[in-house]
C-alpha cells in the first residue's frame, strides 16, 4: 500500500457511562507535518463513534460509503451493525487486492434486553477492524504505534475499573495518553479531539491543545541560543 497523507494513533476505552476516544488532528506526508485540523473521529448513527488512523483519503471514502449505505436503508443500525459493515467493507477491499489503509475503532451503546421486555440495559461495545478486515473486541483499544506506546499505560489505569471511571477522569486519561504520544511519536501533535458516547448521545469536542513540557529534553550544561 502507498501512503500519502496519514493520521496516527487513536486511543479508546470503556468508562462508567459509555465509550471515549481521542486522536490528534495532524495529517502527515511521510515525516512532514503537512496538515492540521484533520478530523479523525466521526459520528455515525445516533449511538456510534468511529476513530480512524491511516490514510486520510481512505477515511473520507469509508465515511462516504457508510453514509450512502445507511441512506439506502432506513432501519436503525447499532454499533455492532456498523462494526460488521466496516469489517465487510475492509475485507472486501482486501480480497480485491486493493486494501484500504485504515485501522478503525468502533464504539457505542447497544440497546440490550436482559430478558424482561420492561427492563432494558445499555451494552458498551468497543472493537477494532484493521486494513485486512481482521477484528477484535476489548475494553481498551489503541491503533497504530499507540498499541506499543500507550496501550500498556491505559490497560494499567482502566482495566478492572471501567465502572468506576467518571467522564472527567476518562478525558484526563485520554489527554495523558495523547501527551505521551506527542513526546514519543514524531507524527503526533498536541492538538487533539476527544469524543465520547453515553446515554445522551454522541459528543465530539472541537480541536484543542494539551499542555506539554519539553524541559525533560534539556541538559543542565546545555547552551540554548535564544
From Swiss-Prot:
Non-catalytic component of the proteasome which degrades poly-ubiquitinated proteins in the cytoplasm and in the nucleus. It is essential for the regulated turnover of proteins and for the removal of misfolded proteins. The proteasome is a multicatalytic proteinase complex that is characterized by its ability to cleave peptides with Arg, Phe, Tyr, Leu, and Glu adjacent to the leaving group at neutral or slightly basic pH. It has an ATP-dependent proteolytic activity. The 26S proteasome consists of a 20S proteasome core and two 19S regulatory subunits. The 20S proteasome core is composed of 28 subunits that are arranged in four stacked rings, resulting in a barrel-shaped structure. The two end rings are each formed by seven alpha subunits, and the two central rings are each formed by seven beta subunits. The catalytic chamber with the active sites is on the inside of the barrel. The keyword rRNA processing does not apply. InterPro entries: Ntn_hydrolases_N, Proteasome_beta4, Proteasome_bsu_CS, Proteasome_sua/b, Proteasome_suB-type. Keywords: Cytoplasm, Nucleus, Proteasome. The gene is PRE4. PROSITE patterns: PROTEASOME_BETA_1 (PS00854), PROTEASOME_BETA_2 (PS51476). This is Probable proteasome subunit beta type-7. Gene3D superfamilies: Glutamine Phosphoribosylpyrophosphate, subunit 1, domain 1 (3.60.20.10). It comes from Encephalitozoon cuniculi (strain GB-M1) (Microsporidian parasite). Coiled coil: none annotated. It is found in: Cytoplasm; Nucleus.
